[in-house]
Amino acid sequence: MKRIVCTLAALWAVFLVGRTAPALAHEDHVHEAVPVEKLGSVHFPISVGPEAQRNFDRAVALLHSFEYEEAQRGFREIADQDPKCGMAFWGIAMCNYHPIWGPTTQADFDRGRLASETAARLGGKTDREQSYIAAIATYYKDADHVDAPARRMAYEKAMESLHQRFPDDLEGTIFYALSILGNAPTTDKTYAVQKKAAALLNSVLPKAPDHPGVAHYLIHSLDYPGLAELALPAARAYSKIAPSAPHALHMPSHIFTRLGLWDESIRSNLAAQRAARAVMTKTHPGSTYFEELHEMDYLTYAYLQLGRYGDARRIVDAIHAVSQLNQEAPQAAFAFAAVPARYALERHQWGEAARLTVAPAWFPWDKFAWAEALTQTARGIGAARSGNVAESRMALARLDTLHQSLAGVKDGYDWADQLDVQRREVKGWIARAGRRDEEALTELRSAADLEDSLDKNPVTPGAMLPAREQLGDLLLDLGRARDAVTAYEEVLKSSPGRRNSIRGLAKAKRLSATGPSSSRP
């Protein structure tokens, strides 16, 4: 399978990167501003006149770049002009189903369900249009007694059927690939599902090299250790295909981060940040785009890996200054918590981490227990490592409560497992503070093994501190340098370029000549 994926990645290089080679030759200028809107080449034919068709194609292009709000506005304008256009309401329904981005808010779901029901009532004017309308209906209907995973799978099956009925429909193939990614298991390290989606997308590539969905979803398909390098052509092309979409400028940094290409990640996210602000100036003056916070988290991560602490500090200050969002999205919740926590933990400023608070106070944290857990984890680790065990236990108790609130929640990513990792990390450092060293090792080994079995959520560039990196730190602290070498090397296999693991590995190697060996890290 890997050979097939490699071959398909080579096809991307031939058909897409070759077309953008002149721009790619000047990396310092890859995100130049464009005077006209550029969202990629999309044509999704429906039964409307020429002007409405152009507007529909634009809205679908925005949808493929996850610019959901602007896409929804476009579909709504079509519906206002032609209230009997069922496909306009299909588009609105699609804008409120986010198969990769995480839990769907109740407001989004209700809005999408109403649009889906309207589309079903109006119907499509062709069998193909009707198939699209029927497919999205499988996600929204029966929500009172069918859980979200089952409805997402029903949508995937419906898109598979559509793809089989209309094999020459490029949009059907692309949306089918996205539906597959929405159901990819987080614990299958063969990535068979993701490779299936990548194969579908690469089959479309020769016919649609400038399609935003092909590049975008290929990045998501290959955003995993061992596969990320195959997505470099797509990453470096996507920002050329749709530079008017902030998410298209940010998305390449997922791959740059996976590969430790920090300078490219910074350039990508600075460009995305500028684009996000331009969008807000036009659509929500005075508000911050939640997508910008997502970009700021990736920027912080990259700055910290390069030791650019002053630049990272400026991001922290900017996060603290946010007073209004265009949407209370999961990306915003994660960034609000992660950015200050990263800044303290990556610098090993344990006292600073212990003093973190859940902020901003105006944000509805009760809707995002998994995000608050980031702050509590940083507090727990920081307090334990600075000698304040009582404070660490308080943070752990809050983590336990948050973990219980997520038990049985099945809507996309399993955050309960991630909280389990975080609880074990805090327990490990509490044990170390109490000189219960074997217990500390057991907890951190357990945390590292569990974290290694999971895939990170796309909302994050990476763990605040990888559990196995923390295990390496503990092993060094206990004088077990040889075991620490193994731990750090394992981290760098999946997260190349991590500053603390590189530094820890260098120190462990210096000490390992005389250090005792042990069982396993």
Q: What is the role of each PLM region?
A:
Residues 468-521:
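C-terminal structured "cap/appendage" subdomains that terminate the fold
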